[in-house]
A protein has these predicted regions:
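Conserved flavin/dinucleotide-binding core of flavoenzymes
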Residues: 102-219
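Short loop/edge segments at beta-strand edges and connector loops
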Residues: 2-4, 192
Length: 219
């Protein structure tokens, strides 16, 4: 079922009973289910289920102690030639504070841009996710890009300059502070980067949390 956003997670006697959606036709519909896996992030999942009072105090204490999302910054730009020839991977930087990595999607998939145009994407993050200064640190990310590739900012045509946080962050929890996959509500599970198993991060953690939830459910 697509284009059917979840409006509520129904809980009775500490057990999940289903969800309420707005279906593709625009009608409110209740779906009965003994198991619910949410990928909306811990904060949104708690809200959909009715708020903190629905969950055990220990679960909410863990949630509130480290309720810090991980903002991310993103710049997409095009150049007439790639910053590095014959490179179809991901450059991860060790000499920067805010710039994390740079990719050249046009080198990975040439059909993504017109001939002679090379799309580049750079991602960065604040030095302290709890106290981000996104405007200043975004400019620092660009400065670090320039330091590694002198002249790039003058040559680049920027398509996207974005900062992601709040309800749509880089990750729903700061690294190392993920919530458990299982909640204190029976049958309700969280998957995604907000519930990162130890040693994982980002997209990898989303997949790992899904596997962990499957193991818990299937036994």
């Amino acid at each position: 079922m697509t284009r059917s956003p979840c409006r509520k997670i129904h809980v009775e006697s500490n057990r999940v009973t289903g969800i309420e959606i707005k279906n593709a036709a625009g009608d409110v519909e209740k779906l009965v289910a003994p198991l619910v896996l949410s990928n909306a992030g811990p904060r949104r999942t708690i809200a959909l289920a009715g708020g903190g009072n629905v969950f055990e105090a220990s679960y909410m204490a863990q949630f509130e102690q480290d309720d810090i999302d991980a903002p991310i910054m993103h710049a997409s730009f095009v150049l007439s030639e790639p910053v590095m020839a014959n490179f179809a991977g991901c450059m991860v930087f060790g000499n920067t504070t805010n710039l994390i990595y740079l990719e050249i999607p046009s080198a990975i998939s040439p059909d993504i841009s017109p001939e002679g145009i090379y799309l580049h994407t750079a991602f960065g993050a604040p030095a302290d996710a709890a106290k981000p200064e996104l405007d200043r640190e975004f400019e620092m990310m660009l400065s670090e890009l320039e330091a590694n590739f002198p002249g790039i900012l003058d040559k680049a045509k920027f398509l996207v300059k974005a900062k992601h946080r709040g309800d749509s962050p880089g990750m729903h929890r700061w690294v190392g502070r993920g919530m458990p996959v299982n909640t204190s509500v029976l049958g309700l599970y969280n998957v995604g980067d907000g519930c990162a198993p130890v040693g994982t991060i980002g997209t990898e953690s989303a997949a790992a949390s899904g596997r962990e939830a499957a193991r818990m459910i299937l036994g």
